[in-house]
Regions:
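Residue-level marker of intrinsically disordered, low-complexity segments enriched
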Residues: 1-3, 13, 27, 72
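Glycine-rich beta-strand-turn "strand-cap" elements at beta-sheet edges
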Residues: 2, 39-46, 76-97
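Short, well-ordered beta-strand segments in beta-rich or mixed alpha/beta enzyme
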Residues: 2-9, 39-66
Length: 97
């Protein structure tokens, strides 16, 4: 399993539009082949900072999503709303208690 974390800082004016984009596309993203979990997290201290947390069955499933028309449509709109460069991480579970 791959855990994907993407931390995004939006312009103040871009927050509402980014939330609309997520709301419109969240079901399609969650139902994309290989996606088993999807969350949007809001930073506790920064109202313009959000993080997506998604689980993928394997790295190829995530890569297929990143090359998909859906990703191109969503990311193409969202990236214009950022106030700074995003931080993205792909992780594997190592130890779980």
């Amino acid at each position: 399993m791959i855990i994907r974390i993407v931390r995004m800082h939006f312009t103040e004016a871009g927050v509402d539009e980014s939330l609309e984009i997520f709301e419109t596309n969240k079901v399609a993203i969650r139902n994309f082949s290989g996606c088993t979990h999807l969350q949007l997290l809001k930073d506790a201290d920064d109202a313009n900072c959000y993080t997506t947390l998604s689980h993928w069955t394997d790295a190829q499933s995530l890569e297929n999503y990143r090359k998909s028309e859906l990703f191109g449509k969503v990311w193409g709109r969202v990236k214009t709303l950022f106030s700074e460069r995003t931080q993205a991480f792909s992780l594997e579970k190592f130890i779980e208690l």
